[in-house]
Design a protein with these regions (language model features):
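A short beta-strand-turn-helix
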Residues: 15-20
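Short coil-to-beta-strand transition motifs
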Residues: 3-4
Length: 205
């Protein structure tokens, strides 16, 4: 874990949220380095090792978020890697003080929750199940689908979430089986929605 006043950062950028409930909205992304979850299909494996990525002061990240807010960003997304490998309380405090935008978290839920967030997207993994506190705290449950076992896993995870939690299935990128399974499940279960990686279709970050 880094010094709580500095965090290893892969990148920051202002783009559109490509996935989930808030897809299509302008957002400022802070991608933190470090992840031990190790999903085989991960499209940001370069973010796994915390070493090699520069540690940046949290106040500098908050200042960058404020610049993005002035340029039209409607919220901040803290992602990774696995951002909860780090203590996020100092970062969210700085963002609240300097930026004021709503704060969103994208996590697999394997670590305790830290920091204050307006929206939590939980994307649990079968090989590293999430903590119960994240299942209950999340606003959005998003499960990546590659095969039928992921549909069963999604149902099991949803049963542990609050009733008003958004439930989304996201086909694995270039997974025709996952796509067919997710579409059919959503068609038959009104409480689920389909999530697509629209940023990849658009060719943006």
């Amino acid at each position: 874990m880094a010094d709580s006043q500095r965090l290893p950062v892969v990148e920051t950028f202002h783009s559109l949220q490509g996935e989930g409930h808030h897809a299509g909205r302008s957002a400022f992304f802070i991608r933190l380095a470090g992840c031990t979850v190790g999903c085989p299909w991960c499209d940001t494996k370069h973010s796994w090792p915390a070493q090699g990525h520069p540690e940046q002061p949290i106040d500098a990240l908050a200042d960058a978020a404020q610049i993005a807010a002035e340029a039209g960003a409607s919220f901040v997304v803290i992602t990774g890697g696995e951002p909860l490998h780090h203590d996020l309380q100092p970062l969210t405090q700085s963002l609240d003080a300097r930026c004021g935008l709503p704060l969103h978290l994208e996590t697999s839920g394997v670590d305790p929750l830290s920091g204050r967030f307006d929206w939590i997207t939980l994307s649990p993994k079968r090989h590293r199940p999430p903590r119960q506190e994240l299942l209950q705290a999340c606003h959005e449950l998003k499960v990546v689908v590659h095969g039928p076992e992921d549909i069963s896993f999604a149902a099991a995870m949803a049963s542990k979430c609050e009733d008003d939690t958004e439930r989304l299935l996201q086909p694995g990128w270039e997974s025709s089986i996952g796509e067919a399974l997710a579409v059919e499940h959503v068609r038959q279960h009104a409480q689920w929605r389909l999530s697509l990686q629209s940023h990849k279709w658009l060719g943006i970050r």
